[in-house]
Amino acid sequence: MCKRGVIYFVVFFYNHNSHKQSGLRPAIIVSNNKANANAPVITVVPLSARVWKRRYLPTHVFIPLKKGSGLDKPSMALAEQVETLDKRCLGDKIGEVVDEKVMEKLTVALQIQIGAYSEYN
């Protein structure tokens, strides 16, 4: 079963003239586990290895290189690019976010992205 906080390779479809991430890349599952178990879709946040780029954005969360993550380099979660995909877009499981504080930061970044904090609206 797909679980929140697990990192998979995901196929993000290319969109011409877009700034969105595309191709096969790592992503963190952020949808809740009840939906993950029952729905045909899953919500993910793509990762980028360009950790120096726009670190100041409140929707960017640094993912440090830690044992168990399966990542080969530190990464940046791009919460502004959250996307719901068919589960068939999931590739191989890479690992998981092993630091609970990182998942807490990612949850806040997602709340900022959807406008849940008035200070960002």
Model-inferred region functions:
Residues 17-24, 29-65:
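Compact nucleic-acid interaction/catalytic patches
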